[in-house]
Amino acid sequence: MDVLELYRRTGALLEGHFLLRSGMHSPFFLQSAALLQHPLYAEAVGEALGKLFKDEKVDFVIAPAIGGVVLSFVVAKALGARALFAEKDGRGGMLIRKGLTVNPGDRFLAVEDVVTTGESVRKAIRAAEARGGVLVGVGAIVDRSGGRAAFGVPFRALLALEVPHYPEEACPLCREGVPLEEV
């Protein structure tokens, strides 16, 4: 599967000057919602990501809301597991709503569309671990961390993409006066 081509085909690969959730600036942004809004593409991505973890026993898949909800669902479907999501708790962390089941000892896979620093998915992981879940792996459609994201368990992505990103003070796009778009 050519993941980058799916991003291009769906208009999900954007060029400009973007402020990422990580606080970094980048000339490129991967708008995964534009890709995942297509059920056939979403299912194909979920199947492919699920195959990377087919040998793990997974009770549930979790992702940060709202962007990861579809991804969690399609990967969980591929693995025959439950699909959960973690929401912002208003205090800088995330929580899992009542009604979404996490039993002590349940093995889980955390997924994210694009990992740059991994902070969003780490918050979802902490929420699941707080309910007794045991992390067995982290998956992403795209790893743009440059190999810097580490979770203490296997981390696998469909695509490793070297995309430049800069702290604000070192951003060449800021120096050139290119307007910044928050994403």
From Swiss-Prot:
GO terms for molecular function: magnesium ion binding; orotate phosphoribosyltransferase activity. Its EC number is 2.4.2.10. It catalyses: orotidine 5'-phosphate + diphosphate = orotate + 5-phospho-alpha-D-ribose 1-diphosphate. Keywords: Glycosyltransferase, Magnesium, Pyrimidine biosynthesis, Transferase. 5-phospho-alpha-D-ribose 1-diphosphate binds at R21, K88, E112, D113, V114, V115, T116, T117, G118, E119, S120. Orotate binds at T116, R144. The keyword Heme does not apply. GO terms for biological process: 'de novo' UMP biosynthetic process; pyrimidine nucleobase biosynthetic process. Its cofactor is Mg(2+). Pathway: Pyrimidine metabolism; UMP biosynthesis via de novo pathway; UMP from orotate: step 1/2. Catalyzes the transfer of a ribosyl phosphate group from 5-phosphoribose 1-diphosphate to orotate, leading to the formation of orotidine monophosphate (OMP). Homodimer. Belongs to the purine/pyrimidine phosphoribosyltransferase family. PyrE subfamily. This is Orotate phosphoribosyltransferase. The gene is pyrE.
